Amino acid sequence: AEDRKSLSGLTEQEAQEFGTLYTQGVAFVAVIAIVAHALVWAWRPWLQ
């Protein structure tokens, strides 16, 4: 039984792994952005 390939060319297992890594990457960038905004807010608050 060979693995059926999807339109993306990934197997289900590969797609699951990619999705996990992608989600972790997005979360990492979001945390960096939140920390950066907090630091800038501490330096020069906006919307007073």
UniProtKB/Swiss-Prot annotation:
Belongs to the antenna complex beta subunit family. This is Light-harvesting polypeptide B-885 beta-2 chain. The keyword Metal-binding applies. Residues 44-48 are periplasmic. Signal peptide: none annotated. A bacteriochlorophyll binds at H37. Antenna complexes are light-harvesting systems, which transfer the excitation energy to the reaction centers. GO terms for molecular function: bacteriochlorophyll binding; electron transporter, transferring electrons within the cyclic electron transport pathway of photosynthesis activity; metal ion binding. GO terms for biological process: photosynthesis, light reaction. One of its GO terms (cellular component) is plasma membrane. Keywords: Antenna complex, Bacteriochlorophyll, Cell inner membrane, Cell membrane, Chlorophyll, Chromophore, Light-harvesting polypeptide, Magnesium, Membrane, Metal-binding, Transmembrane, Transmembrane helix. The chain crosses the membrane at residues 21-43. It is a single-pass type II membrane protein. Residues 1-20 are cytoplasmic. The core complex is formed by different alpha and beta chains, binding bacteriochlorophyll molecules, and arranged most probably in tetrameric structures disposed around the reaction center. The non-pigmented gamma chains may constitute additional components. Pfam families: LHC. SUPFAM superfamilies: Light-harvesting complex subunits. The keyword Cell division does not apply. It is found in: Cell inner membrane. The lineage of its organism: Bacteria, Pseudomonadati, Pseudomonadota, Betaproteobacteria, Rhodocyclales.
